[in-house]
Regions:
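Active-site beta->alpha loop and helix N-cap motifs at the rims of alpha/beta catalytic domains
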Residues: 2-5, 11-132, 139, 144-149
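Catalytic alpha/beta core domains of metabolic enzymes, predominantly
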Residues: 103, 113, 118-252
Length: 252
């Protein structure tokens, strides 16, 4: 595993940070309408936030939506995410059901990347990473989100390194700043990962208005992906994708 990950025609960890746009619709009609809309925006990959979707727990319904998204997006890579309530999402779900849904999505091959929360435990992470690696096509984005604070730099680095050690292809950490130094803490931790622990690409962000600068300076810090909007935001501080693209190009 290297610091560059290839997903379809997209290379993560190389060049400018890639722009990911989340879809947060609750039904298939709205989901596909939003997918068509984002095709008009600068978008390198798409995240389907399935936790917003009304019936994502029903296997056939979930796979139907994935099939439809896959057709609508063409070669744009698709990231499947169930964000749980513990990490700022909509899903109130048991660890067993969380793992089962992610597992059948991996087996389907319809998503190019699958988000797995580090908080679900080492065994869940390891099993899902193993399933993804056996598929030869699906990549795992290990993630951690703190909506109340920014942990110390060493703790951020430790968590990102743990994600790598458990087999994730990409390591992601999002934090909430309560002061300007908190934003610098997140950026410093990201630079440490880039310079000293570059086994995988990393994705980091400092959320909210205070942390917005972290979403446009990935070329400096080493964050491989930034999340933007073409409609509804899925997290505080996300910027419109066209504005993100302008900043990224001018700051490279």
């Amino acid at each position: 595993m290297g610091s560059i990950v290839q997903v379809r025609n997209l290379t993560l960890g190389e060049g400018l940070p890639k722009i990911c746009i989340p879809l947060t619709d609750t039904d298939l009609h709205s989901l596909l309408r939003s997918a068509q809309t984002l095709l008009k925006s600068p978008c390198d990959l798409v995240e389907w936030r399935a936790d917003f979707y009304a019936d994502f727990r029903i296997k056939d319904t979930c796979l139907e939506a994935l099939h439809a998204l896959r057709q609508a997006l063409g070669e744009i890579p698709l990231l499947f995410t169930i964000r749980t309530s513990e990490e700022g999402g909509q899903a109130v779900i048991s660890p067993d059901e969380y793992e089962a849904i992610n597992h059948f999505v991996i087996e389907s091959g319809l998503a190019d990347l699958v988000d797995v929360e580090l908080s679900k435990g080492d065994e869940v992470m390891t099993r899902l990473c193993t399933a993804a690696h056996h598929s030869d096509t699906v990549k795992i984005v290990a993630s951690k989100h703190d909506f109340s604070k920014t942990p110390p730099e060493s703790e951020i680095v430790e968590s990102l390194c743990k994600m790598q050690e458990l087999g994730a292809d990409i390591a992601k950490y999002a934090v909430m700043p309560n002061s300007e130094p908190d934003v610098l803490t997140l950026l410093s931790a990201t630079i440490i990962m880039k310079e000293h622990h570059c086994k995988t690409p990393v994705i980091t962000m400092s959320m909210g208005k205070l942390g917005a600068i972290s979403r446009v300076c990935g070329s400096l810090s080493g964050s491989a992906v930034t999340f933007g909007t073409a409609g509804h935001a899925s997290a505080p501080g996300q910027l419109p994708a066209d504005i993100l693209k302008t900043f990224l190009e001018h700051l490279q």
